[in-house]
Structures are given as C-alpha cells and as structure tokens.
Amino acid sequence: MSVLLLEAFYGGSHKQLLDLLKESVEDCVSFTLPAKKWHWRARTSALYFMQAVPANSSYRVLFTSSVLNLAELVALRPDLGHLKKVLYFHENQLVYPVRKSQERDFQYGYNQILSCLVADVVVFNSSFNMESFLSSISTFMKTMPDHRPKDLERLIRPKCHVLHFPIRFPDVTRFLPAHKRLRHPVRCDDIHAPAAKSHIQTSSPSSYPDVEPPEKMLNVAGTNQSHEPTSVTPHQETASPLCGHEGEKLRPLHIVWPHRWEHDKDPQLFFQTLLKLKDRQLSFEVSVLGETFTDVPDIFSEAKEQLVDHIQHWGFMPSKEDYLKVLCQADVVVSTAKHEFFGVAMLEAVHCGCYPLCPKALVYPEIFPATYLYSTPEQLCKRLQEFCKRPQLARQHVVQVSLSSFSWDSLGDNFRSLLKADSGRMFTDKHMA
C-alpha cells in the first residue's frame, strides 16, 4: 500500500471524505479512531497511531485531518517522516467560538500550527477556513507569555491550498414530492456533470461574488443548465401548476435544522426563533436532525417540550436514505452556526430542494448568494415568518447554488492528484485559480 489514510475522528464529514478516498484512490490503507471524545482524540491519537500503523516500506503518502497532531506522530514514527505528508483542515481551532477567551484551550490550535509546519501540503475545505487560520496565527501566538516564535504564517502559507470538500450527491428523485419533481427533473448525468470552474485555489486571498451569474445557476437537483432564473428573491413568485393547488398552500412550512447538537451551531438562536413564530400563532413544522455526542445542550430537551405540536422528526437518523427523505420533504433549511468552515448538511439539503437560510458570516458568503444570507436574528425571524405565511414562496423558488462545484465527480481528480507521491507540483496550472 502506498497511500496511508489516518483519521483520528472518524465521523461526520471526516468519515465521508475518508470513505470517498478509500473507494476512489488505488493502493491505499486506512486507520481510524471512532468519533467520540474529540478533545481526547486531538490530545492522544498520535500515540495510538504510532502503535496501530505497522511499519511498511511501500508507504509513499500520508493523508490525515488536522485533528491528529502530525508533528507528534512523525516524532514517534520517524519512518513516516519521509512520506509526502498531506494535512486536511475540515475546521481550525484558532477561531473556534468560545464563550470567554479564557476558555480557549491553547493546545488545540498550537497542535494544528505544529502539524502545518511538518506537513508538506496543507489543504483547507474553503477559503474562509484557510484565511481565518493563517490570519489568526500571529494573534494566537501572542497569548504565549514570552519567547514567541515569529513569521509562522510566512512559513506555512506557501504550503496552503483550498480544495473544497467533495460531496457525492445521490439521485433523490424518488424521494422528492411532486412539486419538486415537476420543477426540478433529475438526470443522473446532470448530477455528475463536471463543474465549469476551477475548484483549487492557492493561498492568495480571493473575492467571491454575492450572486452567481445566470449561466452558473443550478436547480436543486444539481442540473447545470443555461436559463434565466425563475426566482431570484423570496419575494418573487413563479407560476407552478402543482404549487398553485390548495393542498400545497395549506400544508405548513416544513423547516429543517440538520446540524450537530452542540453549542457552536447555536441551537439557542434557532429554537428562540421558532418559539417566536409559535407565539405569533404561525403554522410550521420542524425536523431537528444531526448527530449527538456526550454533552447535549439543555435547549434541545426544553425546545422539544415547547414545540411538541410542531415536530415532524426529532433526532439523528442513522439511515442516510431516511435522512435524505426528510430533507426532500422539507421546504427551508436553516443554519444558525457560529462555527462553520464548509457546511455539508446545508448543501445536501439544497440538493434535496430546500431553500437555504444562512448567516452572512463564516464560510456561507463563499458558497451561497446574498439572497440566502441573513445578518441578524431579527432578519432570520422575518424571513421565516414570511415563509410561514406564504410557504409557496420557498416551494416555487429555484435555488441558485452551484452544486456541481462541490461534487466528487468534479473534485475527485484533484484529490487523486493530491495523493500522488511523485507529483512535483501538487496540481497543474489548469487546476489553480
């Protein structure tokens, strides 16, 4: 085996990526740890992999996420030091939201900086992730009392690239309600159509347009077609034979929240918003999905009791098919995240026909046009209130998000190139933005 895949937190998007690589990259072997006790994985996984990974002279490339302290592993296993070491950042700890600055554990961010210094290639899933990490290094290191190292960003930046997280969008046609099928016919060859634009960027900062041009507009099933948008804002209505039926008008708005049950996803804001809608006697249904871990914020049990009459689905759905069915039945997908560097769940929901509402912050402006972003909790509440009163506005809207830009079929070759040991440069010029 020439490619060694290591994942210290084998769950969620970390698991999705590793599974794709295992399926698609020849001559690879993987070693993982379960997605439990994240903090302990970050602290101790290097020691585990030191013992778990057998010596093998055929290894040429080592790929791992930034949960693992790569510097520790290389020190513990000098035989791995000569490999091409690729470090992938799903998230970074330098800007992880904490309630008070004193609560930030210096060690996690410090580990990631050390890992970057020993890696040969450092890859981020978004420009926001990369720039927020690199621009925070200097400030982060100033928390040291003295003898602070200098110029770490200058040493790390030349290694850095952006390679968006790849999603394998399944054909969900059979799960779509009639009004979604009529508006958005799905063909498998459309779902897997190559993206028209490059997906690799160097570490130079870049700007992103607020709205994709019409020729980039994709329908929610991923079909890349050149046509004028039938809807640009939630205030424009489009004629639709089925959506005009009384049944569609009377069915309550279905809101889905498909995120980890942790404080950094700000469930407090989401449930506070729903309770305001309830107090205003607005009609809606809600599905709260996403993974749960050891410590679940109290707001979930409190909200479940208060919103019991509105709940469609509650809790993690182990079956991916069942999860997709719920997304296909929903109308609006909401993010209230305070910590997000890509957002697989939001894009999967868009693929299933949901209208996205995201904060105008973090990675979201990089992926979603301005019409899907809100700046304040009041704006989020106002948008949902409008959709509750007129759910057909969300149901008739054609979402303008370039899903093919994030598909495995578009990005797979770039990952395969990344994992080639003999590539003098990581990518050819045609892959560089």
UniProtKB/Swiss-Prot annotation:
Its EC number is 2.4.1.110. Its main location: cytoplasm. Coiled coil: none annotated. One of its GO terms (cellular component) is nucleus. It catalyses: queuosine(34) in tRNA(Asp) + GDP-alpha-D-mannose = O-4''-alpha-D-mannosylqueuosine(34) in tRNA(Asp) + GDP + H(+). Pfam families: Glycos_transf_1, QTMAN_N. SUPFAM superfamilies: UDP-Glycosyltransferase/glycogen phosphorylase (SSF53756). GO terms for molecular function: tRNA-queuosine(34) beta-mannosyltransferase activity. The keyword tRNA-binding does not apply. Disulfide bonds: none annotated. Disruption phenotype: Decreased postembryonic growth, characterized by shortened body length. One of its GO terms (biological process) is tRNA modification. It is found in: Cytoplasm; Nucleus. Residues 221-239 have a biased composition (Polar residues). It comes from the Eukaryota. Keywords: Cytoplasm, Glycosyltransferase, Nucleus, Transferase. Residues 194-244 are annotated as: Disordered. Belongs to the glycosyltransferase group 1 family. Glycosyltransferase 4 subfamily. This is tRNA-queuosine alpha-mannosyltransferase.
